[in-house]
Each structure stands twice: as structure tokens, then as C-alpha cells.
Amino acid sequence: MGRNIKIIKKNLAFLNDFSPGILACLIISVLAYGLEILEKQLFGQAWLESLVLAILLGSITGSCFTLPKYFQKGITFCAKTLLEIAIVLLGASISVNAVLSAGWNLLASIIFVIFVTLILSFTIGRLFGLSSHLAMLVACGNAICGNSAIVAVAPVIKAKHEEVASSIAFTALLGVLIILFLPFLHPFLNLSFSQYGVLSGMVVYAVPQVLAATASVSFVSVQIATVVKLVRVLMLGPLIFALSILYHRSAQTRLRLHTLVPWFIIGFIFMMLIRSSNLIPEKTLIPIRFIAQLFTVISMAALGLGVDIRSLKKAGWRVILASTCSILILGVCSLIMIQLNDLNPIMF
């Protein structure tokens, strides 16, 4: 009896702490779905998908209003946990054969683009007057996986807290801008759905954000972009190892590389293996995709709520210019590699 009471109290505490933020994200998500339906009725099609609308509505709300602190836990839960679950569920729609069919050509291209972006971004950062540590943080953030890479690299290169805060300040806003504008560029880039997936996987900051950048284009783009982005994230380990040697860090730092693989990547791979073993019935794939998309829309609302345009002041114009140039370099290099190597993988 006493154990049951403790469980009830724990659940009530969870609801009390998380429900305000979750409810805010749900309201924004419902509005986003409603606006998408309204678009279809007025124009015959949705020019802005619910994913994008959720980000926009969330960003407007987050920038115009300062939400009370008790909203934060629920918003963080939606932005992080729900989105990670969506990524895991997405693994059920991709088979191992599909990944292997991408070939070594794609893998080599990803590594090459990351390498070139790191060097050029670091150089440009230094030319803009950034410290070597800050320039490296900006370069790693854009080349690998945004804030996650910045946080992982910072202790290895002994970056100052101010440098970490400055490099992170503009990342959230720039990441949202990429998600919003990349789908609009697709018709003008003359890329197939597969090639657009490669481009998105190369330039979008985080694995979860890949869904928002590609869902409005095609599900093929979603699949390929996710795989490409996962490969980029997995490059964080070798990068940390190289930087630890370059900056003469101790062996203890290098031994922590196993912590650099997030649980949802392991979950994604696990689901992909289950799908490849034919253990997931085909009729369940549609509901799984629906749940993944629903969680993603809610998470995009939370992501938008975390964006504050006023953070531009914290970043400083040098960091803003360096980050913008870095992402442009990444995009141009990716497009060049797509065309030169005829990167057009097929997922099934």
C-alpha cells in the first residue's frame, strides 16, 4: 500500500513539474495542424507544413513572451525526450540493406566535407578575430552536430565558459533558420529527393532537426538525411580523439569517447536491425511513422519556444558572421560533392 502511494505521489509530482510546458507545446502543435488544414482548404495545398508552423509559432511565442520557469521542464522534455523517441521510431522505416546500398562513396564524401568545413571555418573564424578556441568551437559546431559538438569539444581544448556561451548563443536561431529555409530551396537546387536528403543531412545541426527539414519534401529525403546525419554525429568521436592529441590532453579524456554516442542513436540502429530481420510487421509501420511525426511536431513547438531572437546580442557580430560563413561553406561543399560524386543513394 505504501509503495503504491509513493508511486502515485511520484506521478503527481511529474505532472506538476512537466504538465505546464507539455501543455504549451501541445497547444502550439494543435494550432500548427489547424493552420496546415486551413492552408489546404484555402490554397489546395499546404505551403508550410505543420512541422515548420510549429517552429514558427513557438519562436514567435518564445521571443515575444518570457514564459515562467515552471514551463521549462515540460518544454525541455518535449524538445529532447520526445524528439529522441521519434528518431528511434524512425529506425523502423530503414533497413540495414538500405544503409549499405549508400556505399563507401557517400561515407567518404561525408568525411571529406566535414574535414574541409572544419579547416575553412576555423580559418575564417580566426580572420574575423575570434580566439583559436572560439573559432574551433564554431567550426566543430557547424561541421558535426551543433551544440552537442560544442559542449563535447570545449573541455578537450580548454575553452572558457564565455567562449562556449558565445558559440552556443547563435546556434539555436541559425538552426531554426536552416530548417525553415532549406525546404524552400529544394525546387531551385535541381536535386532529387535522395540528393536533397544528403544535403539536409550534411547541413542541419541536429539529428532530430533533420525530420523538420525534410518531412515536407519526401519521406525518402527523411530516411537518407537521417542516415547521413547519424554518420556525421558518429564522427564526433574521432574528432574528439584527434583534438585531444592536438591539444595534448590526457588519456583519461580520450577514454570517454563511448559517452559521445547518444542513446537514441543506439535505439535507432536497434530498430533498424529489427526491421531488417523482418520482426516488425509491415502493417505497423504506418502507425509508427504517424507517432514519430506527431512527436516531432510537438518537439518542434518546444524547439521554437527555446529560441529567443534577443540572443543575437549575446553572440556578438564576429561569431554571427563566422557561424553564417561556416554553414554556407558546409552547404556549398556538400552541393559540390553531391554533383561531383553523383550522390543519389536509394533507401528502401
From Swiss-Prot:
Compartment list: Cell membrane
Transmembrane region(s): 13-35, 45-67, 74-96, 106-128, 135-157, 167-189, 196-218, 223-245, 257-275, 285-307, 319-341
Coiled coil residues, start to end: none
Keywords: Cell membrane, Membrane, Transmembrane, Transmembrane helix
Major localization listed first in the record, in broad terms: membrane
Gene Ontology CC: one annotated term: plasma membrane
Membrane topology label: Multi-pass membrane protein
Similarity comment: family membership: Belongs to the UPF0324 family.
PANTHER family recorded: INNER MEMBRANE PROTEIN YEIH-RELATED, UPF0324 INNER MEMBRANE PROTEIN YEIH
Protein's name according to its UniProt entry: UPF0324 membrane protein BH02290
Organism: Bartonella henselae (strain ATCC 49882 / DSM 28221 / CCUG 30454 / Houston 1)
